[in-house]
Amino acid sequence: FAMYTIKHSTKGSIAEFDITKYTKDSILITGVEEMNRIIDTESIKYALHAIISVRTGRIYGYEALMRPQSEVFKAPLDFIRIAKTSAKLYEIERLTWKLALRTFHEYIKEGMVPQGAKIFINSISNCIMDAKDISEIERENKDILNSIVLEVLESEEANSEYVHAKQEWISCIGAMTALDDFGSGYNSEYALLTLKPDIIKIDRSIISGCDRDEGKADIITKLVQIAATKNTLVLAEGVETREELKKVIECGVDLLQGFYFGKPSFEPMKCTEQMTGEILDLCVEAERERANGTI
């Protein structure tokens, strides 16, 4: 591996074996065959991560998260990396839509998700399906098309033409768009103006510790105020503590997601009465404090 690395770096330089780099990059050498097997056999499952409505304290929807069934790929990002270097992103995009929606369909039939729940799909930002595959998706999922929420990520690698084309399709089928990782660093304000999403997912980097950081709390509050003028919902992503939950509710967010409520699972999470009660109690407390002018 060290010989391979130095051959592909600056001529005449000296390289030492780097175990961290080896762990990260060795999969690029060994993973192609495994990736092809996964694609050919459609060996991908989708875990669902619950999204909760602040207003009701109940399930609003679920984010579908890729889980390749493989000992080689320990993390989904490794699978995406190898697919990108192998020019196989289109196949991953197609399988994501096909298998995630199939999974959601099965849960609906088994009565495992609440009626009206949304399914959030992470689409690859620089990839778009052709008309044939889109028609197949529509035909196989005609009864749940309006349950779809397309998650888009505005980044340097994103193809803006593809992103807007996907949004047009989503609008035509009566579905919704969510802007993912808002505030993570790449031109978020511009993306908000140009993409006009139905939902904004505030990045975990802002939510983390917002109960102890007045600056973060101010950002969340101002974003909620801006979103309200555009009829856009705000989702707090990565809520991990009760203190963070209390603060984002005080800031006025509409939707919640994070390990505080539960981790992604192959069995869709349901809100317990205790969880619903906690959220609604915090809402009442926040309203009382607003009325008293303390927040």
Cite the ranges covered by each PLM segment.
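Aromatic/hydrophobic pocket-lining residues that form π-stacking "cages" and hydrophobic walls in ligand
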Residues: 2, 100, 223
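Charged helix-capping and loop-helix junction motifs
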Residues: 30, 134-137, 164-165, 214-221
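Catalytic core of bacterial c-di-GMP phosphodiesterases, primarily the EAL and HD-GYP domains
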Residues: 14, 90-164, 238
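EAL-family c-di-GMP phosphodiesterase catalytic domain
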Residues: 19-23, 53-58, 68-72, 124-127, ...
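C-di-GMP signaling machinery
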Residues: 1-47, 55, 74, 82-89, ...
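Surface-exposed amphipathic alpha-helices with a cationic face
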Residues: 105, 142, 164-174, 221-228, ...
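Short beta-strand edge/capping elements of PAS-family sensory modules
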Residues: 60-63, 147
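Cytosolic catalytic headpiece of P-type ATPases
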Residues: 64, 75-78
